[in-house]
Amino acid sequence: MSYQWLEKALKTIHQANWYRSVTAITSLPGSTIEIDGNTFINFASNDYLGLAGDPRLIKAAVEATQQFGTGSTGSRLLSGHRELHQELETAIASLKQTEEALVFSSGYLANLGTITAIVGTRDLILGDQYNHSSLKNGSKLSSATVLEYDHCNSEDLQEKLQQHRHQYRRCLIITDSIFSMDGNACPLQKLLSLAADFDCMLLVDEAHATGVIGETGAGLVEHFGCSNQPLIMTGTLSKALGSLGGYVAGSRMLIDFLRNRAPTWIYTTGLSPADTSAALEAIKIMQNEPQRRKKLWDNVNYLKEKLCDFNLFTSDSPILCLGIETVEKALTLASQLKEKGIFVPAIRPPTVPTSRLRFSVMATHEETQLQQLVTTLNQLI
C-alpha cells in the first residue's frame, strides 16, 4: 500500500515522454563508441579533450591502484588521505591561480558541501535560474533564503540585490561559468562588480570550462583575467580531465574552513587513488599539450559554421544545442540519428524548459565525423 504511488508516478512520467533509462557503452570512451555491438560517432560525451581513454591516464590509474589499492578506505580526516590527494590539490590550485584547493569525491558533492558550509538561515542566495542541479540543491539544503535571477541577466540580479541584500547577514551569488544544457557563458565581470558593490560572495562552477576555456585551459575566470579576484571556484575532474571527482579552489582561509565545515568532504570516503592519479596526469597533459584545446576549438568552429542555418543556441563552448519544437520530435530525431550511426542525446523537460539535441564536441573528432553529422542533419531536418 505504501509504495503503490510509485506505479502511478512512473505511468505519468511515461505519458509525458519524460521517462529515462540507461544505455550501456561497451568500449573505451572516445569519439566513437560501441553500443550493442554497433559503432557510433559519439556526440554525447563531456570528455572534451579526449583524455578519458588516453593510455597515460589509464597507466597512471593502474599504477596508483597497484601502489595504494582500490579505495581510500576512509574519510580524508581519518584514514583516507594520501599524498596523491595533496599533489592533485596543489596542481588544481596552481592551475586556477588560487592559494589552495580541496578535492571532493564528485563535482556534485563539492557544490553541495561548499554552499551548505558557507551560508545558513540568516543568509541570502541569488542563483541563475539555469544553474546546475547541484548548485540548486546545495542552495536548498543550506537553509538560506534562495532567489533566482533571470538567466544571465545582471540587471535582474542587481534589482534583487537592491531589494533584498540589506535584509540578510551574508549573500552568496551562484552561477555556472558555462551552462551545461545551453553552452553559453555567464556575464562574469558584471557578477564580480555586483558582488563587490553589494558585499557578496561569488561562487562560479567551472565544470564545463576547466580544460576548455582560457589561455592555459584554467576556465572562464582565466579567460576574463579575473583569477586574482575574490571568488570561489568549483568544478569537476570528470569532464575535460577524464577522471572522477570535484574540487573547490580559493583562498587558504576558505579551504581551511571547508575542511572543518563541509559535510560532503568530512563525512565521505576520499577520492580513490586511481581517480586521483588519473586527474593529476590529465592536468599535466592538458598543460603540456595545448594543441588538444586548439583542435577542440577548431572542431567547434567548423561545426558552428556548417550548422549556421540551423536553430542553434548561442554558445561559448563545445556544447552546441539545436532547439526542437516538441519532446516527441526531439526523441524521434535522436533515434533517427542513432539509426545513422550517430549518438546524440535528446534533452527534454524537466531537465530543461524546452527540448533540444545537445552536441558535445571533442578534440578527437575527425572532420569526416563532423561532416557526417552535418550531412545527416541536413537529410533529417
Swiss-Prot record:
Catalyzes the decarboxylative condensation of pimeloyl-[acyl-carrier protein] and L-alanine to produce 8-amino-7-oxononanoate (AON), [acyl-carrier protein], and carbon dioxide. Pathway: Cofactor biosynthesis; biotin biosynthesis. This is Putative 8-amino-7-oxononanoate synthase. Its cofactor is pyridoxal 5'-phosphate. Its EC number is 2.3.1.47. GO terms for molecular function: 8-amino-7-oxononanoate synthase activity; pyridoxal phosphate binding. The modification N6-(pyridoxal phosphate)lysine is found at residue 239. It comes from Rippkaea orientalis (strain PCC 8801 / RF-1) (Cyanothece sp. (strain PCC 8801)). Pyridoxal 5'-phosphate binds at residues 107-108, 180, 205-208, 236-239. One of its GO terms (biological process) is biotin biosynthetic process. Keywords: Biotin biosynthesis, Pyridoxal phosphate, Transferase. It catalyses: 6-carboxyhexanoyl-[ACP] + L-alanine + H(+) = (8S)-8-amino-7-oxononanoate + holo-[ACP] + CO2. InterPro entries: Aminotrans_II_pyridoxalP_BS, Aminotransferase_I/II_large, AON_synthase_class-II, AONS_Archaea/Proteobacteria, PyrdxlP-dep_Trfase, PyrdxlP-dep_Trfase_major, PyrdxlP-dep_Trfase_small. It is an enzyme of class 2 (transferase).
